[in-house]
Amino acid sequence: MKNRYWFMDLKILGCSAWLFLSSNMAFAQSKASPKDSVKTEKEETKKKEGFEPYEKLLKGAETKQGLLKIHRVKDKIYFEIPNEVLGKDLLIVNKISSVPAPINNAGINKGMNYENKIIRFYKDTTNKKVWVKTFDPQITVNSQDNISASVKDNYGESIVEGFEIKTLGKDSTAVIQVNNVFDGNAKSFNNLFDNIGMGGSVRTKDSYIDEVKAFPNNVVVKSYFSTQISEGKTSAEKADLTVGTTTNIVLLPEPMVGRFSDDRVGYFTTPKMYFTDSQQKVEQRELITRWRLEPKAEDEAKYLRGELVEPKKPIVYYIDPATPKQWQQAIIDGVHDWNKAFEKAGFKNVISAKLPDPNDTEFDVDDVRYSVITYAASSMANAMGPSVVDPRTGEILESDIIWWHNVMTLLQSWMRVQTGMIDPQVRENKFPDDKMANAIRFVSSHEVGHTFGLKHNMGASFAFPVESLRSPEFTEKMGGTAPSIMDYARFNYVAQEGDGVKQITPKIGVYDEFAINWGYRWTGKKTPQEELPITQKWIEKHQGDPLYFYGAQQEETVDPRSQAEDLGDNAMKAGEYGIINLKKTLPNLIEWSTKNGENYNEAKSFYNQVINQWYVYNNHVLANIGGIYLNPTVKGDQQSSYIPVPYETQKEALAFIKKHILTLPEWLFLSPLNQKIRPAKNTPKGLVEQSPYNVFREKQAAILYGLMNDNKLLRILEFEFLNHQKVMTVAELFNDLRGFIFSKSIKKQPLNIAERMTQKNYIDALIIDTQRMYEKTEKGIFSPMPMMCDYACSHTHLDKADERNLEFYFDGMKRLSEVGSAKRAELIKVRAIISKAMNKADNDTQSHYQDMMVRLNKALGNN
């Protein structure tokens, strides 16, 4: 779930040469405030005057010892805060423990971490308060520098809650009543409904604290929050909802040494700002998120000699006991598969996965001491791997994988559509358990990779030549379809019948082993600055090797190498092979999915999946037109940062588009299957059948809108402007499209319904985009915009808005660009063609032309 609050993006600090701003502030306050210093016995006795006696307040209390001492007196919950905890860095971690059906259906489930916040407790006996403060921990300053005083004043702490001190215990420990922050009366510790996007208020009369637990380094509070939401337009259409939550308050460990990120390796990151007297601008960095893996003290010499050693603290994942037994081992195997990669970083036996001990009464899947693969009973078809991160250093403290039960539906769909022609075992509605287990193992490894801090590497699959994906030897040796399991490479749709390919999914590959070594190899250095030259050399060793290329996930595809669901180094060749398989699959669709006496619902869904897969291939190809190879470069690596997709490749892509989607694929939309079924998609209202005519029209229109996309055309103009030799121009693109789409009109030949549809879609795409471009300039349009915009990975917990987006953004005044002129000129040329052809057309074609002329004249203002 995407983070919407700054305190959920809590950032890293820390190394021995630097002091945390926050620590400086705490130190200054403790020295300056006599009320918080050690008191004599007489002073302590006097200090307790004015408070209710400790024994009276807590008479009959159920007490639990831990990080904080917890007292429960009937329905009242008290925290007794040890003096040694005051001023310490604590992290609030909120998770969902249970949900009702409406929230489940929205994709929000047990195990999700929806809110984190760093806090400190401060005791103020003068005002009889315990203040809870938060701060932005990305700021670091050397306490010896003059600027540290200014940093302290300009990056101060903020109060999020104030508790009245009810009494003082032994050693004057403050006792506070905390019900209001856990029962829904206050949002400071747990702001559930805002963070899951529901808004509204907690209905406090129907909300309560269920359980409190204390452990040496954390406390756990379980609550139930109720609310009411509107389901329709009338006041009567309301739904009552109750959500179970677990709040952990965790003592953060001694800060780990961070590691600076590098755009050439895909890790989630957290930002840092370093202030020093010597700098002329603030140093802004990103630190990667990773587990604290260090050799034991007695093994450090062995480790540095290159011997494999076990880490001080291995990583343990617990499998939710609610996981169906037949999938438990596959999920465990997917976790254990990463041990080989960690050996590249010098560590052995790093990871283990197991079921919790049923006799362990302390085990709780919502306790942040445990990393859990949670199994969610839901119709949602997905899996995700978020982590809880130390906001000061990027250290991963705990990870959770949310495994939705219905993810198997997605796997079944992919495998049948993409590989059904080469594997008879994946053709039916239910696969053999061993086939599904292999797919589950693949997904498990991918999601576990995220919990190690790894981001999607969408560019990995581009390293493999398309033809090599048809080789059993190559795919077995190289690990399936990509050198990284963190790509969305999916299943091998390139392989053909008779090729003998068995390894159809990615495995943990060359890039993954490299990334784990780069992120986790221990250097023994004390600061990220010290180890920076070392980590840079590790990357330089493989610079230019496509097996080690990292391609970031893109919101709008600019670099066609880095796409989801694609395979190989040529989308056109891969798409052709994929379509060959789809053409063979389609006639078997009913036989594979429907038994005698059954309705055709499965076949209808299957038909829709085939259409969607065909559309995916066209989209992969589309990205090459106006595409740019974007390389994360550094000085000295001899690479270009921006390379237009080669002219020949763009022409090949346009030819594919003309062949497969600007021409009606009769095999797909005029299939004899339409006598029995229509393509149908799953919706909240159930299975909805669709007209093949409308589906084709919408898919084709989407591709044409993609071709007319302003940013795509502006990228083409950009390289035309820069005088790159042999690049496709906007004029050439329009000439090619017009010559193909209106070829029969130019020859004054009648058009069939599909050809008329294509002309309508083309003109509509031009008109709509042109009208948008010439809309009145709005306030703020002249505000500056960066050429390279920020990228936010949409996958998981540490989406950063300050990472390279790999998207080109252009000034808001697009109406002054050449794109507007080119589109208007194209509309005028199309109108001229139609005008000449109109009087020599048959009735249907003439009606079509008349309609188009009305639209064109209106769009062009009768010019």
Model-identified regions with their sequence ranges:
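Auxiliary tRNA-acceptor-end handling modules of aminoacyl-tRNA synthetases
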Residues: 31-323, 341, 350, 356-409, ...
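Active-site neighborhood of thiol-dependent amide/isopeptide-bond enzymes
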Residues: 323-327, 331, 433-437, 465
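Conserved catalytic/binding loops enriched for acidic/polar residues
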Residues: 461-863
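Solvent-exposed, polar/charged alpha-helical surfaces in well-ordered, non-transmembrane soluble domains
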Residues: 329-336, 340, 438, 442, ...
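Sec-exported extracytoplasmic/periplasmic mature domains
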Residues: 336-347, 449-450, 454, 491, ...
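Extended catalytic-interface subdomain
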Residues: 384, 389, 395-403, 444-452, ...
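The catalytic-center signature of Zn2+-dependent metalloproteases
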Residues: 42, 49, 355-376, 438-495
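Bacterial Sec-dependent N-terminal signal peptides
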Residues: 1-32
